[in-house]
Curated annotation (Swiss-Prot):
Keywords linked to the UniProt accession: Chylomicron, Glycoprotein, Lipid degradation, Lipid metabolism, Lipid transport, Lipoprotein, Oxidation, Secreted, Sialic acid, Signal, Transport, VLDL
Sequence similarity: Belongs to the apolipoprotein C3 family.
Superkingdom per UniProt: Eukaryota
UniProt GO cellular component terms: chylomicron; intermediate-density lipoprotein particle; spherical high-density lipoprotein particle; very-low-density lipoprotein particle
Protein name: Apolipoprotein C-III
Lineage, highest ranks first: Eukaryota, Metazoa, Chordata, Craniata, Vertebrata
SUPFAM superfamilies xrefs: Apolipoprotein
Gene: Apoc3
Signal peptide limits: 1-20
Protein's UniProt keywords contain NADP: no
Organism, as annotated: Heterocephalus glaber (Naked mole rat)
Pfam families (UniProt xref): Apo-CIII
Amino acid sequence: MQPRVFLAVTLLALLASARALETEDASLLGYMQDYMQGYMEHASKTAQDALTRVQDSQMAQQARGWMSDSLSSLQDYWSSFKGKWSGFGFWDATPEEASPTPAPEGI
């Protein structure tokens, strides 16, 4: 084999292997990009779910606080209202102490 032909074949083999490595690198790069994109989407979804749970928990705590405050306020109002009208004896009577209403005659 002549040195020129050998040199040309060697050069073509090097170019072909370089092209194959470049294609392999490109496919590996594409794979890594897809992998990282999937990872970032998963991490983003996980973070969003965690944030939603925290917000739901905070909203539930705030709602419980509002309900507790409202109930306490209502109890205070009822006690105040009852205290104002307690002088009439209306609130002090129990159902057993209340006199029964007589039945109308003729029934």
